[in-house]
C-alpha cells in the first residue's frame, strides 16, 4: 500500500525591510533643479535556507535618479525587501521556481511601496516601479546557466 502524498505547504512567515539606504549627494542644491531626472533601476533577487523548510528571499532594488545634462545624481535609494517563507512537501525540482518567482512576486509590491515612500519622504516626487515579470527573469537566468555551464547547478540569484 502506498503512502498518501502530503500536500505542499507554503506559508508567509514574515515580510520585512532588511536594509534601506538613501543618498542625496548634492542636497540642498539639487532641490532647486528644474530638469526631470533619468531614473535607473537595478533589481536582484537572492534566497537562502534559514533552517530546514524555512527560507529567506530578498528582492533588492537600487534606484538612481540622475540629471542627464549635468551628470549629477539627485538621489540613490537601495532597498532590500525580504520575506521568510515556510515551504514543505515541495519536490526538489519545484523549489527553485517557488523561491525565484513566487516569493519575489509576493515581495515586490512591498518593495515598490518602500521605494516610493522613501523617495517622497526625501522631498522628491514619488517613483513608482513598474511591475516586474520574475518568471521571465527566472527563465532567462535558467537558459543562460544551461548554455554557459550545462553540467553545473544553476545559481538562483537573478539580476535585472
From Swiss-Prot:
Could you tell me which InterPro entries the record lists for this protein? Answer: SecB, SecB-like_sf
Where does the protein end up?
A: Cytoplasm
Question: Where does this protein come from, organism-wise?
Answer: Nitrosomonas eutropha (strain DSM 101675 / C91 / Nm57)
| Subunit architecture | Homotetramer, a dimer of dimers. One homotetramer interacts with 1 SecA dimer.
The entry's cellular-component GO terms read: cytoplasm
Gene name of this polypeptide: secB
Q: What is this protein called?
A: Protein-export protein SecB
- The protein's role, per its UniProt record: One of the proteins required for the normal export of preproteins out of the cell cytoplasm. It is a molecular chaperone that binds to a subset of precursor proteins, maintaining them in a translocation-competent state. It also specifically binds to its receptor SecA.
Record-level GO BP terms: protein folding; protein tetramerization; protein transport
Q: Which UniProt keywords apply?
A: Chaperone, Cytoplasm, Protein transport, Translocation, Transport
What Gene3D superfamilies does this protein map onto? SecB-like
* MF terms in GO: unfolded protein binding
Q: Which family does it belong to?
A: Belongs to the SecB family.
Amino acid at each position: 500500500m502506498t503512502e498518501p502524498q502530503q500536500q505542499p505547504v507554503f506559508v508567509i512567515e514574515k515580510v520585512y525591510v532588511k536594509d534601506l539606504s538613501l543618498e542625496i549627494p548634492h542636497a540642498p542644491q539639487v532641490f532647486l533643479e528644474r530638469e526631470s531626472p533619468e531614473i535607473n533601476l537595478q533589481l536582484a533577487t537572492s534566497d537562502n535556507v534559514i533552517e530546514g523548510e524555512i527560507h529567506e528571499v530578498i528582492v533588492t532594488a537600487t534606484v538612481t535618479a540622475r540629471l542627464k545634462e549635468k551628470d549629477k545624481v539627485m538621489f540613490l535609494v537601495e532597498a532590500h525587501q525580504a520575506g521568510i517563507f515556510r515551504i514543505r512537501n515541495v519536490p526538489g525540482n519545484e523549489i527553485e521556481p517557488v523561491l525565484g518567482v513566487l516569493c519575489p512576486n509576493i515581495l515586490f509590491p512591498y518593495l515598490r511601496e518602500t521605494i516610493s515612500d522613501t523617495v517622497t519622504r526625501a522631498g522628491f516626487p514619488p517613483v513608482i516601479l513598474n511591475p516586474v515579470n520574475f518568471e521571465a527573469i527566472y527563465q532567462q537566468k535558467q537558459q543562460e546557466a544551461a548554455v554557459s555551464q550545462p553540467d553545473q547547478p544553476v545559481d538562483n540569484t537573478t539580476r535585472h
